[in-house]
Amino acid sequence: MLFNLNDEARIIGISGMIGSGKTILAKELARDEEVRGHFANRVLFLTVSQSPNLEELRSLIRDFLTGHEAGFGTALPESVGHTRKLVILDDVRTRESLDQLMFNIPGTTTLVVSQSKLVDPRTTYDVELLNEHDATSLFCLSAFNQKSVPSGFSKSLVKQVVGESKGLPLSLKVLGASLNDRPETYWAIAVERLSRGEPVDETHESKVFAQIEATLENLDPKTKECFLDMGAFPEGKKIPVDVLINMLVKIHDLEDAAAFDVLVDLANRNLLTLVKDPTFVAMGTSYYDIFVTQHDVLRDVALHLTNRGKVSRRDRLLMPKRETMLPSEWERSNDEPYNARVVSIHTGEMTEMDWFDMDFPKAEVLIVNFSSDNYVLPPFIAKMGMLRVFVIINNGTSPAHLHDFPIPTSLTNLRSLWLERVHVPELSSSMIPLKNLHKLYLIICKINNSFDQTAIDIAQIFPKLTDITIDYCDDLAELPSTICGITSLNSISITNCPNIKELPKNISKLQALQLLRLYACPELKSLPVEICELPRLVYVDISHCLSLSSLPEKIGNVRTLEKIDMRECSLSSIPSSAVSLTSLCYVTCYREALWMWKEVEKAVPGLRIEATEKWFNMTWPDE
């Protein structure tokens, strides 16, 4: 049962995104015979809402708990706690409001219904979106006044419409009402409009959006801006938190941790979902293993709010969905510079002739999504002198060849470059140095011999690079030694690269390196002894490196090392020098390897060793 059977005071929560059915669930609980029997019909249901009269609500709760309307000030008689009572507070917006409405009285259970997670997550029920069967029943109730598709009506049309609502009760009810008593021909048109990301009619869209927009008024301005930034990404995709962090940091002047806190706040308000990759269970130091997802309706609201006003004056210039060409309204507005700081493009294959001239003097973030084997980058990049974050993502089935790359001379202010499912362009001595690039991401790319060119001084091209991430690059056989010339590096992450066999022996040149992640590199056989000469190394992840059989004998020299993740390795022992790892505080290994750390555990006070079960399944990322 949801409610406690003892007589202690208790607070529990119901949480979920706007329109998910939280209030309906709470009202059903208030009417439920078993619940009412448990509380002897002593159930109070109050709606708090956005601008509550807290004094009046508090008075109503006090009168309910005392059983009469006599005033007791702030004190309540001892007899109050002798009976069980249920107080349901619906639509609570802030923790401050909740605190003023709470009475810590034995026997009293308070059920808090809120979009945000205001109650301990361990006692909060998260309302899930509806499965197909329940979604269809709810939709049919609204569209046909019955719980099933009427005889003779197209079940295929109903299924398509229900699918577009993605299980959100609010959307299902509004959409059903807009199609009620309409002929099948109208439904067919509605399905076509929905498939294009358009509303069935203005009423359908406005009713859903109005309810969601109202909840955004509680956000502080910066958090609301970050919510609107989510519209820059394609619907239905997992967004790596690293991409979002880089974006928010640059355009909102936030530190990494503060940007992540904003995402957590949005997640707590059910305006997005944070998903942690289950393969990373150790205490890592990167956000790369976390992804963000967002319900399509929430993304549509962000786009709706963003795409108001004159095109050239918008802070964000976003394409809601993939199109063969750029929107015609963009071309009609290109007679003056665009005001956008964030630009997001989503197309198919583009040739040089498909682009038209655009001027983005204020653009700091450019996101290019496409689906093609060949892609010509937009020529107007050459004029984006303020660009800080550049994201290129190919959603096609094979890596694309990029044309008009490397990056033009005007992008020397670039801080972060994300390349996904493309052939990494070959570096050349004529390439203009990216003097301010700090972070480079190569995801599902063909690296070819891009970095392995001794005639090129990579450190000159990337003089300030601090982080390099290489993930799912199956043609990477070894990390080129030239990369070790980038002495500013403090993080190297090589993950899910099935063919890498060794690291360069001159890795000791990376005197600033703090993080070395080598997750799921099954052919990596050893670590170079030079790793023991890294004076600032804090974190090493060698988990799921199935062929790695030993650690360097002098690993104990790395006195700064704090965390090691070595799940699913083939290590048969730990070097005796490991007892000198005086800063080590956290080790993750599989259960059979616990005995290896016994001596180290005795020698290093406070060392925590976490054992996990064996598991490994190297799969390509889902689309």
Swiss-Prot record:
GO terms for biological process: defense response. ATP binds at residues 16-23. Residues 2-51, 119-249 form the NB-ARC domain. It comes from the Eukaryota. InterPro entries: Apaf_helical, LRR_dom_sf, NB-ARC, P-loop_NTPase, WH-like_DNA-bd_sf. GO terms for molecular function: ADP binding; ATP binding. Belongs to the disease resistance NB-LRR family. Potential disease resistance protein. This is Putative disease resistance protein At5g47280. It comes from Arabidopsis thaliana (Mouse-ear cress).
